[in-house]
Amino acid sequence: MCDSDIKVKQLEKRASGQAFELILSPPSMDAAPDLSITSPKKKECSLEEIQKKLEAAEERRKLHEAEILKQLAEKREHEKEVLQKAIEENNNFSKMAEEKLTTKMETIKENREAQIAAKLERLREKDKKVEEIRKGKECKEPSEK
């Protein structure tokens, strides 16, 4: 189309904008005729072709479903592995914590037994000294009388 084929007519002027009307002139016979776009003609499909297409579609659906099931199985397997690993780590942590606690309790028990033994030894020493002092006093008292 040329610029002469279009005419612009102003309709209204407003604060929000302007309105125009475009007038297109009829196409001239000199210009190349417009090629009308037509859709390709559909050919008749036979019953066999339709059946083949349906079978192919069914096969695609089955393959797609099998792929989805495979992905789900892989996802479940991964989840099982992750869960198993978490359980294993938890068990290892529990064992380590139990061993640590047992070691700590044994150390505390040994220290307590050592403290008790030391106190008993001090008490025996005091008892010896008291006994020596008592014997010493008993020996001195008869001579004083």
Curated annotation (Swiss-Prot):
Post-translational modification comment from the UniProt entry: Different phosphorylated forms, from unphosphorylated to highly phosphorylated, are found in the mature egg. Progressive dephosphorylation from the mid-blastula to the tailbud stage.
Entry's localization field: Cytoplasm, Cytoskeleton
Positions carrying Phosphoserine: S16, S25, S39
Alphabetically ordered keywords of this record: Coiled coil, Cytoplasm, Cytoskeleton, Microtubule, Phosphoprotein
Single GO MF descriptor: tubulin binding
Statement: the UniProt record of this protein carries the keyword Zinc: no
Coiled coil regions, renumbered to chain: 40-135
Recorded superkingdom: Eukaryota
Tissue specificity: Ubiquitous. Mostly abundant in brain and oocytes.
Residues annotated as signal peptide: none
Main subcellular localisation: cytoplasm
GO cellular component: cytoplasm; microtubule; neuron projection
Gene3D superfamilies with a match to the protein in the record: 6.10.280.30
Gene Ontology BP term (one): neuron projection development
Domain annotation SLD: ranges: 4-145
Functional description taken from the UniProt entry: Involved in the regulation of the microtubule (MT) filament system by destabilizing microtubules. It prevents assembly and promotes disassembly of microtubules.
Self-association state and partner proteins as the record states: Binds to two alpha/beta-tubulin heterodimers.
Designated name of the protein: Stathmin-1-A
Protein's organism: Xenopus laevis (African clawed frog)
